Amino acid sequence: MAAYTKIKKDEDMVVVDKSTGGNGKYVFDPYNSLNKEISEEEIRELLAKYNVNVPIHHLVLYKRAFVHRSYTKRPAAWNEQNNITLVAKPEDCHELYTKSNERLEFLGDGVLECIAKFYLYKRFPKADEGFMTDTKIELVKNETIGRIAMEIGLHKWFMLSKHTEMKNLRCNHKK
């Protein structure tokens, strides 16, 4: 019988060593049955709820905004080089994605920071830059954004690997 040992090959995934003699073969199971992809109708309802009246172009970008890098395909060559075998996708799970939200997050972080700075500049006309910087940091930090995402229900559509789900990253805020 093979000995199973959890090891860490990458920050976003856990693989299981299935070797008996240290031959370094690994099994990777990222599939998460809790994932639910957001639909166009759900996007429309969410935007309408907050009075955001914009047409939905490029639905794929809205959907990609919810894809964590842990639920993306790794290059086959990387898997082969590291002796990693991807388990078969269970029927109740979504396919792994080819792209994550990271590049969109990079843009979004910049837009959010710009909006926060503009708001604070207008809202506190006599405040010094130290106060505005500290307040901006509090507004745009992950814990704040995670709490707001939970409050408005965005967490329902995050696409995360099973391991990332176990680390409770669907709720990326401190309580």
What residue ranges belong to the model's regions?
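RNase III-family endoribonuclease catalytic core
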Residues: 2-175
